[in-house]
Structures are given as C-alpha cells and as structure tokens.
C-alpha cells in the first residue's frame, strides 16, 4: 500500500483543488485499518481505502469501478475501492499524480517514453477525464455538506496556457534550401498550388529581410496575440550551438536577440527546451540551462522552467537510466511542462492543475511543479491523424473539462505549425482553443 507520506501528499493536493483559498493545515488525515478519517475542527468524515490486493488489482487495470456524475453533470466518472464501498479517492489519485505506474514500468517507445498504451488512463478509459480534479470536487461537495458554515467554496479561476516549443527557428537557411523546400517538398509532394504560392510569398519576404522568415514571425505573432488576450504564453528554446547533436539553430543567431526583445516587451515567459540527448546525459541539461541564462542576461531573466524535446521524461527506476526528476533538480528547474502523451491528447497525470511531483523512490514530495500538457499540435494531426473538424472538437472538449474543474488548459503549438498544410489547423483548432 501507499505510505503515510504519500497519503498526506495526495490529500493535500486534493484539498488545494477542492478549497483553493483554504488553509490546508487546518485538516488532519488519520489512516485507519480500513479507511481514512479526515479531521477538521470538531468535525470529521471517513472514507474507505483499498487493501493491498485491491491496490495491485487497480494497478493492473483489473478493478471494476462504479460510476457517478461528473462535476458538470455532463457524463460519469469511475470510483474505485472496496466492493462494498468503492469510494477511495486518495489511493488512485496518488497513482495518477505520482505517475506510480511509470516508476515500475520498463516498457517504452522508440524514444524511451512511457507509452499511453501501458497507462492506467488507457486501461480505465480516463484519458479525457481529469479524474483527480473530479475527485477533488467530490471532496469539496462532501466537506461543504458536512460543515456548510465552515466551508464556502471560492472557485479558482481557470487558465488557458499557450506554450510553444521552438524546435525550428527558421524555415529558410539559404536560397538553395529555400527553393528545394518550395519546389521539392511543396510542389512535388503536397502538389497544392495554394501552398506553393504561399511559400513563394514567404520566400520573397525572407529574401528582403531574413527576420521575416515565417517561423520567426510566428513566434512574434504568438507573443503579440496572446499577450493582447491577457494570456501568459511560455516559449521553450533550445540552447545549442551549430554542430552539436539535435541542433536545428544556433542560440547565438543574432535574430534571437530581436525575438527575445519582443518576448520581453510582450511579457512572454522563456523556458528551456531540453535537447533530445539531455534526457540521457548527466549534466547536459544544466549546461544548456546555464547557456540560455547567459544569452538572456541582458533581460534579467533566470530560466527555471523547461520542457524536454520529444516529451522525453523518464521516471522508470533503474540504475542504467537517468531519472528526469534528478536532471531537472540538478539543472535548477522548478517548473516542468513535459508530462503529456505524444500519441494521445488528454490527462496523463489525471489533473490539469499545477502540482508538485512526487519522488516514489525516496517517498517524498519534490519542489518541482508539473504543469500537465493537455493538447499538442503534432498529436492531433501526426499521431491521431484527425481532421481539422475532429481536432477542433477534441480540443474544445478537453478545454471545457479543464474549465469545469477550475484547472489550466496547457496547449502546445509549434511555431512551424502555422503555415502551409498546418494553416487550417492553426486557424481552425489553435486560435479557437486560446480564445478566452
């Protein structure tokens, strides 16, 4: 079973979502032989908990849940626990928040990532349900019903959080490469003359001023549009030099200073996009973080947030693999935005609220705050292969579920996914998604 530390950690997170403005130290949770007793003031409520056999069955995806209405009463959510009282909201919440299943699974895809197919959210069909947050809303309802004079819910204002991984700084690097891209890829492969015409227009602008490259201008547009909408976008930049592994642009590119000046003006948050190899090599992520800080020094920035390239987060316990928690901590990262499934949009962590990650190895809470990734552009059209209409419907559905539980809708849209064949997705999916 889960430890007392894990129980307290999970209960505190549920309380933060249920009663965001309430002092959680007012509560005390007591672990009983067959359940939990939550004490507050002179009152208390009891909840059941799984035994060891039920916990193992849950982790294997073999537990049969019962169902209740969700907070918005638009569907149903599963409850797990003892058969006679399946209302253990703490044990399964710990599994989702801590990514417990990932710590003990050596099954990975070609990029060393934990797969959606092996996840509990897949086994219990929860990928589109912020189940932990739904449980927090149940806790809120029960506490308010128990002591209405003590608890008056003060809902948290949900947020839309646009994020942008700058995998590619520019589309055009030379005349030869530009013409090859236009007449090779666009004309011969896409065979869409509208795209070819658009590319030629972009090429002519680039020829007159290389800062007019469409990928650079996409960054500028993101910052201006999203700041004007009252949002706080986060931009993740690689910190590599030409010739290093995974380099697609050199951080010393003079155009980046102009980009960062604009982001500084528009109050965009700048983070580190950890290179592919930084998930495997000791000290590399810290080196990249220090390098990015050097180039941002004139803006008084200190980079403390990151997202790994290819969403390469490793939590599996093994002496041969570096642990992402250690890499982030050693690099001075306080906020991570990596945890989402590349192959499926939704709620990998069971929540859309920022929360501190838990170190299962050492049975303690960390000081690294996770901002779960809910939607990624490439997931919609590369992995799930959705049409614009279906991608918009899924994105809006997930956004609404974040709003229903007062969480953060974190969406990733790359700066190279705004033009050509991606333009319909950008205009038809992304722009409606960030509409307040």
Region locations from a protein language model:
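Catalytic domains of cell-wall/extracellular-matrix polysaccharide-remodeling enzymes
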Residues: 11, 19, 33, 277-365, ...
